[in-house]
Amino acid sequence: IDSGFDNYAGVTFFGTEERILVGWAANWVYANNLPTGEFCGQMTLPRVLSLVDTPLGGPRLAGAPVSDRLFGEPVPVSGSLPGEVYKLTVSGEGEAEISLSNSLGEAFLFGVDGTGDIYIDRSNSGARDFDPEFAKPEYGRISAPRFFDGPWTLELTFDRSVCELFGDKGTRAFTQLLYPTEPYTSIDIKGNARAGISLIK
């Protein structure tokens, strides 16, 4: 359901027209030491589940975020980010990397690599020394192969300290916690890709 580091104990709802799943955006390995101050723990976006037939992986469980009901229409991105809560849609073909960064040089990276894998990299995304496990390299970067050939679209929803990345019609999802020292204000795209951004309604 999710290839990221921080999605745990997902539950679905009974009596709804759609099969909706919500998870706990955390990881038991370091959940007790998160540098969030006034709160501890948050939930993922609700996701509508479905089966999608993929050319490279056969039938796959997909989760489409219901954020379309929360966010407005996307507008082109010109290099700067509008705040700490937004949805970013990136479309491209082949290899590309998207970087969200701040003035301190901290950056969260995601994209499609040269082997065709979708990946996220929070190795230099901000505070990581609050827990020895969180700081380990194995909790920095993760990737997963695509289930589709050709052009791709990635949707990333960012909400202050949690971001959720969806690709290949929701058959790939990555949930991860990030703790930038100050908000990300810049976006940079390398490769054949373009982006649009949507704000919460």
Q: What are the residue ranges of the model-derived segments?
A:
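Beta-rich accessory regions
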Residues: 1-201
